[in-house]
Amino acid sequence: MAPKKDKKPKKSTWKFNLDLTHAVEDGIFDSGNFEQFLREKVKVNGKTGNLGNVVHIERFKNKIIVVSEKQFSKRYLKYLTKKYLKKNNLRDWLRVVASDKETYELRYFQISQDEDESESED
């Protein structure tokens, strides 16, 4: 028999990006305030404000990067982003869209001008 090798669990990290470029450039979204919101609201082991060395939240200009050493769901990040938008009354204008596997992006809702004009004529 071949000797068994010790299997060490891989230390994996989860990394997600939030692209806030459009909303920040238009001046309706404060990325610093949102970063602080995430630091206060992200739960680790069922407790908020317990980031420690497990979850790192960084801001580079108009992007926020969340790196976690413990399992962290991309869906949870979307949930917190939507919660922040609702709290600041931005939910009616902005939506959270996945642009790729590790990135969310804030985009404006597309409202067609043709529908508004036809309704006002009636």
Curated annotation (Swiss-Prot):
- In Pfam terms, one family for this protein is Ribosomal_L22e
Q: Return the InterPro entries for the record.
A: Ribosomal_eL22, Ribosomal_eL22_sf
Q: Does the keyword Ribonucleoprotein apply?
A: yes
- Phosphoserine, modified sites: S112, S118, S120
Query: Which GO annotations describe the biological process of this protein?
Result: cytoplasmic translation
Assigned keywords, A-Z: Phosphoprotein, Ribonucleoprotein, Ribosomal protein
Write one Gene Ontology MF term: RNA binding
Domain of life the protein comes from? Eukaryota
GO CC list: ribonucleoprotein complex; ribosome
**Family classification:** Belongs to the eukaryotic ribosomal protein eL22 family.
Instruction: Identify this protein by name.
Output: Ribosomal protein eL22-like
- Provide the species name: Bos taurus
Q: Which classification does the entry list for the species?
A: Eukaryota, Metazoa, Chordata, Craniata, Vertebrata
Q: Which gene encodes it?
A: RPL22L1
